[in-house]
UniProtKB/Swiss-Prot annotation:
Keywords: ATP-binding, Cell inner membrane, Cell membrane, Membrane, Nucleotide-binding, Repeat, Sugar transport, Translocase, Transport. ATP binds at G39, E40, N41, G42, A43, G44, K45, S46. The lineage of its organism: Bacteria, Pseudomonadati, Pseudomonadota, Gammaproteobacteria, Enterobacterales. The gene is rbsA2. SUPFAM superfamilies: P-loop containing nucleoside triphosphate hydrolases (SSF52540). PROSITE patterns: ABC_TRANSPORTER_1, ABC_TRANSPORTER_2, RBSA. This is Ribose import ATP-binding protein RbsA 2. The keyword Isomerase does not apply. Coiled coil: none annotated. It is found in: Cell inner membrane. Its main location: membrane. It comes from Escherichia coli O157:H7. Its EC number is 7.5.2.7.
Length: 506
């Protein structure tokens, strides 16, 4: 690593009126380094990067490029310093070609005429350098999100950027697209580019970063090198408490009677005859590999999928569930794994999203009870600590963590007996995870039976009283007490060593 930093941000402060979003933050980045920037929502990560990119002007502090003071007051200043920030929302013109986007603001011209052919040739060279599969003449609107991201990177290379800032770049990418992006980022790092990578996804940070810096409440907490990366320490730095406090599943209440009892439930395809039981006040984990049938089993219970066999009991009574409406009437709530496509109404207000499942129940003679709806939404926002300026704010404008809590609040509002939670803390920062786990524990203390589907093994181990593991559409086994370990879960999930699988369930 080069001994001279390409970037130093010293004692950076940024005030909005009397509120300080940044309070004396330091950040040092070297050439040929992937430097991850972590912190909860509101920690100041994006604000710091906007100062670096010239979108905001620092209230105080100093920025050095190659060891020399450099004043950045505008985006043009940042570009002249070799800094490019790729925002979560792509800054591209969809109706223009890839080449036109790469050269936007710096078009080649001669005698007052734009040299489109030369722009296409130069743009294609940059695209080929990235290994991209599209052409410089393609319209941006025809590209995938991952390809549009490559256009942004190509534009940075065309501008000879030396510092590339990426803000949550994998948020809308598939696993394959994410893998390709990582390969590209590491190649740019090896070519000497400094990359600042903003993310709350620890797996990505572990895979990519050479160093990690953490912000909390607008202040610099510290940095860790790749050799010293530790999940527990990162969590402590981000939220101010150890990883063991994140789950806090000590609920100190006796488990009640069986609240949800599923007998040999099947759809004749993805889900083979499967049985499970969840008691009042219990959080039961449902683990397994992707494609094992976990989400499909929850959808059968909630009436989203049609069952071809089996039986469901709620509080000891056999029930027939043909639709989500029937499930809701029985006091069953279902948090879908895809909040944006299958859960939230992004263009509607937060309050409307919260009361979506209670409107029919609380209506008077077919008329909306607005006072009751407002009380429900206000109470839910307070209970779940949803950070919104007011209940009528558009759901699509909220952070991922607040969107997830908003969706959970919809099911809390029905006064549930049973909650089916599919990936309840996926895609949210550590602080939001902690609050979601707190809500789950509170609901369990009130006697709600919770079935939690999760692909995060620490979450399954940390939150579950018992764990069922699915494999190839069937329940492969059940784990209790000290047998709930990541190793035992993976043994059951993969089918490796079936003799051991039987041993850990006995």
């Amino acid at each position: 690593m080069n001994s001279t930093p390409v970037l130093e941000m010293r004692n950076i402060a940024k005030a909005f009126g009397k509120f300080y979003a940044l309070k004396g933050v330091d950040l040092t980045v070297y050439p040929g380094e992937i430097h991850a920037l972590m912190g909860e929502n509101g920690a100041g990560k994006s604000t710091l990067m906007k100062v670096l990119a010239g979108a905001y002007t620092a209230t105080s502090g100093e920025i050095l490029i190659d060891g020399k003071p450099f004043h950045i007051r505008t985006p043009k200043d940042a570009l002249s310093a070799g800094i490019t920030l790729i925002y979560q929302e792509m800054q591209l013109a969809p109706n223009l070609s890839v080449a036109e986007n790469i050269f936007l603001g710096s078009e080649l011209s001669h005698g007052g005429l734009v040299q489109r052919k030369e722009m296409l040739v130069q743009a294609q060279k940059v695209i080929d350098r990235l290994g991209a599969q599209f052409n410089a003449s393609d319209k941006v609107m025809t590209l995938t999100i991952a390809e549009q991201q490559q256009v942004e990177i190509a534009r940075a290379l065309h501008r000879n950027s030396r510092i590339l800032v990426m803000d949550e770049p994998t948020a809308a990418l598939s696993s394959r697209e994410t893998h390709r992006l990582f390969e590209l980022i590491m190649r740019l790092r090896d070519e000497g580019m400094a990359i600042i990578y903003i993310s709350h996804r620890m797996a990505e940070v572990y895979e990519l970063s050479d160093r990690v810096s953490v912000l909390r409440d607008g202040q610099y907490v510290g940095s860790l090198t790749r050799d010293n990366l530790n999940a527990g320490e990162l969590v402590r730095m981000m939220v101010g408490r150890p990883l063991s406090d994140l789950f806090n599943k000590e609920r100190d209440i006796p488990l009640g009677k069986a609240r949800l009892n599923v007998h040999h439930l099947t759809d004749g395809g993805k889900v083979q005859p499967s049985s499970l039981l969840v008691r009042s006040g219990e959080i039961v984990g449902l683990a397994g590999l992707v494609g094992a049938g976990r989400s499909e089993l929850a959808q059968l219970i909630f009436g989203v999928r049609k069952a071809t066999g089996g039986m469901i009991e709620v509080d000891g009574e056999p029930v027939v569930i043909h639709s989500p409406r029937e499930a809701i009437d029985l006091g069953i709530g279902f948090l879908t794994e895809n909040r944006k496509e299958q859960g939230l109404f992004l263009e509607m207000a937060a309050a409307e999203n919260i009361t979506m499942a209670t409107l029919e129940r609380d209506a008077r003679w077919g008329m909306l009870n607005r006072k009751k709806a407002q009380t429900i939404s206000d109470d839910a926002i307070k209970l779940l600590n949803i950070r919104v300026p007011h209940a009528q704010v558009r759901a699509g404008g909220l952070s991922g963590g607040n969107q997830q809590k908003l969706l959970i609040s919809r099911w809390v509002a029905i006064g549930p007996r049973i909650l089916l939670l599919d990936e309840p803390a996926r895609g949210v920062d550590v602080g939001a995870k902690s609050e979601i786990y707190r809500i789950m524990n509170e609901m369990a203390r009130k006697g709600v039976a919770i079935l939690m589907i999760s692909s995060e093994l620490p979450e399954i181990v940390g939150m579950s009283d018992r764990v069922y593991v699915m494999r190839e559409g069937s329940i492969a086994g059940e784990l209790n007490g000290k047998n709930i370990t990541q190793e035992n879960i993976m043994t059951l999930a993969t089918g490796v060593n079936d003799a051991h699988s039987q041993a850990v369930t006995s």
